[in-house]
Amino acid sequence: YLSVKDLLILNEKPTVSLKSGINEVIIEISEKRLGVTAVTENSRIVGIITDGDLRRMLTKSEDFSKLSAEDIMSKSPRTININAMAIEAMELMESNKISQLLVEDNEQYAGVIHLHDLIKEGII
């Protein structure tokens, strides 16, 4: 049985800080190609920003360029422990209608697991 750790792409760990500007957020999401970035403080997850959040913010905010990660992020994102089973990740994604989960290891940000990872490994 595969664990989240087995699927985690350790070198793809998109992250920004609370004060990161919108340009940095967009670059991080684009370069890591997962459609998401964690917002961290002292290696702990404090929020998440998805490409969908960015699109919604474009329609709401008049001065988009002055926004920081803290202004855009969703607080209390869904997370999963690095030692959880991959099937648990799938169930969490299905029940919350999401395609990415932030992964924690001893309450520290460890990376992202994506629905595509589960599909690729035949979990779904």
Stretches with model-predicted labels:
Residues T15-R33, T40, L58, T79-S99, ...:
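The conserved cystathionine-beta-synthase
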Residues I9, T59-K60, S74, K120:
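Phosphate-coordinating loops and pocket residues in cytosolic domains that bind phosphorylated ligands
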Residues I45-I48, Y109-V112:
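Glycine-rich acetyl-CoA-binding "A-motif" of GNAT/NAT acetyltransferases
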Residues G47, D51-D53, E62, K66-A69:
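Nucleotide-binding motor/catalytic cores of P-loop/tubulin-like NTPases across gene-expression machines
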Residues Y1-K13, K66-P77:
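Bateman (tandem CBS) regulatory domains
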Residues L34-T37, V46-G47:
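Conserved active-site beta-strand-loop modules that form the wall/rim of enzyme catalytic pockets
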